[in-house]
Amino acid sequence: MKAICFMQEVKECDLTIREQMLVCRRALRKLRWPCVLELFAQAGTEEQPLSLRPGMVELLHAAANGEADVLVVVDAAHLYCGRPELEGLLASLLHYGIHTFGAKDGNWIEPGGRRWMVLPGYDEEVWNGLR
């Protein structure tokens, strides 16, 4: 699977942008998914709607062009948006056949809060390596 990583920088956050990158990259290495694009939204943009944040336009263009199969984020909480906005993003990505994966816990992030099983062989060492 080809992946796109998205990271949201926040000034008062538990993870720096660098730590988020490490979590996502460790997950990609463990799963052997190549990363075709890394996108970042700078601190201060987390109050904006997801669609207006840096990187989101590029993400949706890449999705429409079939450049990836999966979006990798630390987890849903690190997108800093409400559930309706998250549902909209997930639905838009699924329209293009892109699923969203939470690198922190190894779970797929799906509309309606559905949870799929953790991928076989995936454990918390990806996350625990930072703490």
Task: Label every model-predicted segment.
Residues 1-131:
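Short, structured surface patches at the beginning of a domain
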